[in-house]
Amino acid sequence: MPITHVALSPSPIPAPTSCASPWIVIPTTIPPLNSSQFPTIPLSTILLPASGAPHPLWEAFANQPSLRAENGIKFPIQLTATTPIALTSVVVGFFSTGEEGLFDEETIEEMITKGLDDMRVVHTGDIVRVQWMSVLARVRLCEPVDQGVITEDTKVIVVKESRGKKTGEPEDGPLANGIDLNGVDDSDSDEDVLSQGDDDDENNVDLPGVSTFMDIATTLGTPSISTPLRNGPGASISGLSDAPKVVKFTAKPLSQKIPTTLLLPTPPAADDAEARVYVRVNELMGLGCFSGDWIGVASDHGLFGDRLPNGSRAWRPAKVYSLPELYAGKEKVKVLMKGCVYMSPLLHANLGSPSSVVLTKSPFMNPSNIQQGALLSPVTTAPPSSATPQIPPTAKEVTLLRISTPISTDRALQPSLLAGLKTYFETSRKMVKVGDLIPVLIDESLGRNLFSPAALLPPDAENAEEIPGAGDELLYGSHGGAGIGVNNTGKLCAAWFRVGTIAPTDEATNAFSNGMTSQQWGGVAIVDPGSTRMVQAGSERGRIPPTLNSPWEYYLNIVPPPIPNNPPPIHPALELPNNYISPVHRRLRELISAATSLRSIKLGLAPLAVLLTSTQRSIGKRLLAYRAASDVGVHIFHIDAYDIIGEGGQASDVKTEAYLRARSERAASCGIENCVLLISHIEAFTAERMAEALRDIVADMRIVIATTTDVDKVPEPVRNVFTHELEVGAPDEGERTGLLRQITQERGVRLAKEIDLSTIALKTAALVAGDLVDVVERAMTACSERMEGLAAEMEGVTVRDIQLAGGDASCLNKQDFEAAVDAARKNFADSIGAPKIPNVSWDDVGGLANVKSAVMETIQLPLERPELFAKGMKKRSGILFYGPPGTGKTLLAKAIATEFSLNFFSVKGPELLNMYIGESEANVRRVFQRARDARPCVVFFDELDSVAPKRGNQGDSGGVMDRIVSQLLAELDGMSEGKEGSGGVFVIGATNRPDLLDPALLRPGRFDKMLFLGVSDTHHKQLTILEALTRKFTLHNSLSLAKISETLPFTYTGADLYALCSDAMLKAITRQASKVDQKIKEMENPVSTAYFFDYLATPDDVAVAVTEDDFMEAKKELIGSVSQKELEHYDRVRQMFETVDEKKGDATVDKKGKGRAIEIMVDGPGTGGEGAFGDDGDEEGLY
């Protein structure tokens, strides 16, 4: 029978949490019809062979919560056809459980290879069947995907593992009945865990370990049916106490919804999913209830909590369910979840966002017995009679109050808002209580596109009067509705309502008159879509749940749930997303919280105006303001200055001021203590009257935030309006790592196991948040192209097959990120000034071992141990290379940048000069600011003597060079003080005239590390340089570089040796070209040179080998760039800077004029200590 490969996945398909695929590929056959061997199989059914060997399907499905023990071992799956991928390599780990030396490794390798051949599809984690049971082997790694078929070209690698490693035999649990219970981890029974973590519980439940496949099917989705706690309201409770138990739990809001199909008993489709709480199965007995029972939930705020007028704690009913096994995790992780109750963030917010809550079984508790200072005291109540309703009463009429936000007050979104409100209550029977917050999701882009004035207002006149802004559409603008709850893509946003009043039905009113009170259900009522009347009666000002401790944006899918790079120990739905928070974000959040707090308003504190500045665009200032306001729970109203600014004279300024005041009034209508006014591109307000308008707006609001990318263009009167200025600088390496992690998680990007985001962040120096988003998107594009190329190489394989197989090939890997970073640097280098890392290594530098050691001492220590300089300790960040020209000072600086993965800035003297007063010094400041933004970075000043000569000796009338030197000295001092933000910037200067430099540059803390780069004084050093220069040449076998170096004089610099090698290669090329020309002339049929090289040339004709004669001829024509007299002069200069005159003493006092100045200049670096100069004077040549 033909074999067909299919991919299976549990239904519903679980969300991926790593690069592993939720699908598993298996081979299948379709049995013939009307065969006695194969009975009739129902449709949509797959039969799996029952054998003692572990089937990969069991392992793949063992951790999935959708397995159901219904009519045997049957469970819902999804199936799709696929083509298996041919594996390039398979790594198998093994160890022997028998005596050592029983089998040699070659025999074991043969057995494992034979076992792999018998497997039709190999999966990562599969157990390989071998002939002897004393040898256990498991597939550890498959490439390029996690599952595929073995071919003749597949490379099998067998590795012996230590028996003590847990990844050996009991990696995922013991083998029971020939089946490996991967992921069911019953190495520690529930009894052991409960005895460790739940000693304070009186009724611990003994959950037996799983030992058979039937147990897998019966325990993964629900609590074990073998326990005394069987699920369902009708279960027996003969062994339980009649008094309801009251337990205190830590409240945890969910970041993702738990699917209803995973709960047992399965709730009705019409039940409100927001009125459910989830606990571990063993904690249900502590409550004395079963999964699916009604319980009472109340906040535990102590004396300051939300209480009723009679002093009792406000509470509400909810249904309690046990966490599915997928969410509960392994037993050792469950200890971390002890005493936690999980609930919807909306329910958590309606309870008052408490840190802890109390739960009790009885929903008919008497609130008067819930006194201050006590938890919910157990109340002995009679069993409810048949007349007592088992669900909360149905509301006859519910009045909703609209929370005034920029979204809910936007005219263009009113039709979508009403439609979303209707959809919210029609999906299920919602349970509401007076004061509850209700979110309504709408598509902002779609709502604006479908906006029609004819369908603008609801039919009732009251609502029409409450919608403000019935004026010019410009008052609202295209971005006026952008507020809290808008996701990054601008698709979904949330508008909020609050429940005002609830009118009970006639039946509920009669029940209350017969002795029941409305508080028997905590004041909660059910909204029946068919009978309850919904009324929107006005609006109110208020806040929404802060996202700092409530993941409601993820829960409502406004922001996509993050995919962690590594599977966390606790399911992501049970944890708050760990987003990166920058120091500026934290500071801005504190300012917003302080300005909008009730205490500051009561004390009459002045409002705050914050100006966010940056030197680069797309750095994330506006997004920073949105997230800071979202953390506090206030709304944000955005105004783009370029949208309202007019063109023309004074009349346009008047219109701009009017539009600004009108929009600020709309922001104030949402509540000055509940709304933040955000103005972007504040530099566009250049008119004088705008400063007065901004001052009035700030006085009417509690906090105003403005952004600009060029603070120098902001008029001084406008800038004086702001009380705080926060600079959003380019992110450093740690901040870029956090941003990359957050970007990849929010976009649901799966990363390969080899990816280290800190390494990627190191290569993205000088890139800001917007650029990092582009890098991730480019990497995603590169990943798609790579998978398309991989699929094209394999016959019949598509990209979809690779994605189903999973593994690193279907995820973003190092290759994708490298291509994305390279492309981003090439495209953004000119626009944002991102410096490039030169591709020069130490292999390009000949010798200089002592110079390399000195450089590593200066640069490597601050990079690897920054904590040594964190408290203000000065570091040595300045290096000065001096010596004859052509010794490779520039090349050495580039090699330093490459060796330490530093960015490289090369500054030339004319770049800093400007004809306007003050601009030259500003250019120096900009250079160092760009370096700080791109740190770790090297700033290289070539020909430093032309940039910073001695002050007072220049003839320019304005003293430009003197001011440049002074500014350079100030920046160098800032680099060495060890202040925050100054680390990671190293300054390197190069000059062949150090005697012309300003003496102040050579003092400690500036260029205090002076290294002399001279010519090679031995033939061995010349040989080292020649080997570095010719490492990419094709040298003739008879050529000896050592022989060539012995003929060279000691006056050749590195540049001279480079010219020698280049001329030798040129002569070799000329010689080979002459031979080819002669060969063409000797041919019978004359052909062109191009035709010869295209069709007739042999490898020997195009091969160019440099011979000794080529070097000798090049040497005859080479003239050294530095004479012997010049070298002697540089030696004297070196001695002047690196030696101490023993005879120097009182005679120095008698020196005057130039002699005295030279002595002062020499004394400067001389006092820097012996470590400031070369150690033994044995300098090597360089290139």
Swiss-Prot record:
- List the EC numbers from the record: 3.6.4.-
- Which residues are recorded as binding ATP? 883-890
Q: Which InterPro entries does the UniProt entry name for this protein? A: AAA+_ATPase, AAA_ATPase_domain, ATPase_AAA_core, ATPase_AAA_CS, P-loop_NTPase, PEX6_4th_dom, RecA-like_PEX6_r2
Task: Specify the species.
Answer: Arthrobotrys oligospora (strain ATCC 24927 / CBS 115.81 / DSM 1491)
Question: How does this protein assemble?
Answer: Interacts with PEX1; forming the PEX1-PEX6 AAA ATPase complex, which is composed of a heterohexamer formed by a trimer of PEX1-PEX6 dimers.
**Keyword set, alphabetical order:** ATP-binding, Cytoplasm, Hydrolase, Membrane, Nucleotide-binding, Peroxisome, Peroxisome biogenesis, Virulence
Q: Which family does it belong to?
A: Belongs to the AAA ATPase family.
Any one GO BP annotation for this protein: protein import into peroxisome matrix
Q: What does this protein do?
A: Component of the PEX1-PEX6 AAA ATPase complex, a protein dislocase complex that mediates the ATP-dependent extraction of the PEX5 receptor from peroxisomal membranes, an essential step for PEX5 recycling. Specifically recognizes PEX5 monoubiquitinated at 'Cys-6', and pulls it out of the peroxisome lumen through the PEX2-PEX10-PEX12 retrotranslocation channel. Extraction by the PEX1-PEX6 AAA ATPase complex is accompanied by unfolding of the TPR repeats and release of bound cargo from PEX5. Regulates autophagy and biogenesis of peroxisomes and Woronin bodies.
Catalyses: ATP + H2O = ADP + phosphate + H(+)
Name of this protein? Peroxisomal ATPase PEX6
Disordered as annotated region, ranges: 161-205, 1160-1183
> Which region ranges are annotated with the description AAA-cassette D2?
878-1070
Q: Which Gene3D superfamilies match?
A: 1.10.8.60, P-loop containing nucleotide triphosphate hydrolases
Top EC class per UniProt? Answer: hydrolase
* Acidic residues: compositionally biased ranges: 183-204, 1173-1183
**Phenotype upon knockout?**
Leads to growth defects with sparse aerial hyphae, and reduced number of nuclei in hyphal cells. Also results in complete elimination of sporulation and trap formation and a remarkable decrease in the ability to trap nematodes. Leads to defective cell wall biosynthesis and increased stress susceptibility. Results in the up-regulation of the proteasome, membranes, ribosomes, DNA replication, and cell cycle functions, and the down-regulation of MAPK signaling and nitrogen metabolism.
- Any Gene Ontology CC annotation: peroxisomal membrane
